[in-house]
């Protein structure tokens, strides 16, 4: 929210929003997922948001790829949905970030890269931070094992996949692991801790927000001034 507000967006957090429905779909409860989608559809329309912005790769994938079918009986979701990296890619040139002399590695969430095709977009956001050294792991797009309900229903397998991912990331010797999904962030933090690593796991937008907070002075309002975003993610975002 801080980054979007700094860029001039009016950010509205919709507490009444339902879950995107991804866990329900994974469990096979399509009827409940459809009800959640219709609730969100009505809410977005009633609040007159300009776009929905989400910082969760799974939510973004669900809105973009699953909602057209889930909303077949009630009409389309008539508001653009963007992952936060898509918005950041537009905003980076005007954000006051200074120079960050830091070595980081990137973990690509399955639902961001393979699901939404935004792997290059996300990495371009990181690379546009002056001074940052982005070191790729041997398998940057390998699953972390979180998998939403998989972590609950198949905990041992989820941990085993996470441990393998942690080993790969530790091979970069980067003190910071950056990812674009809260679920991946939680899984990687626990996996790295079990492996004895002191690496910190951050969401991309956290790094941007930290840099803005550290840099004194402002360039004024950005190109998003006056737009509304909804959060779960919106313009109202």
PLM region descriptions:
Residues 1-237:
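Iron-sulfur cluster-binding electron-transfer modules in prokaryotic oxidoreductases
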């Amino acid at each position: 929210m801080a980054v979007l507000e700094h860029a001039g967006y009016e950010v509205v957090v919709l507490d009444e929003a339902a879950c995107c429905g991804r866990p329900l779909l994974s469990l096979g409860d399509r009827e409940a997922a459809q009800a959640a989608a219709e609730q969100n559809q009505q809410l977005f329309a009633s609040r007159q948001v300009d776009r929905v912005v989400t910082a969760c790769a799974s939510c973004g994938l669900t809105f973009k790829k699953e909602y057209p079918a889930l909303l077949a009986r009630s009409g389309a979701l008539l508001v653009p949905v963007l992952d936060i990296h898509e918005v950041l890619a537009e905003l980076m040139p005007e954000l006051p970030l200074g120079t960050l002399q830091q070595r980081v590695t990137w973990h690509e969430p399955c639902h961001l890269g393979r699901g939404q095709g935004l792997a290059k977009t996300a990495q371009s956001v990181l690379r546009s931070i002056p001074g940052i050294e982005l070191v790729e792991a041997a398998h940057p797009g390998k699953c972390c094992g979180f998998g939403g309900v998989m972590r609950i229903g198949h905990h041992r397998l989820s941990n085993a996949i996470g441990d393998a991912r942690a080993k790969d990331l530790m091979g970069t010797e980067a003190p910071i692991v950056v990812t674009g999904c809260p679920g991946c962030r939680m899984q990687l933090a626990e996996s790295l801790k079990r492996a004895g690593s002191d690496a910190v796991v951050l969401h991309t937008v956290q790094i941007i927000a930290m840099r803005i907070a550290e840099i004194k002075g402002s360039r004024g309002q950005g190109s998003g001034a006056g737009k509304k975003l909804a959060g779960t993610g919106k313009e109202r975002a």
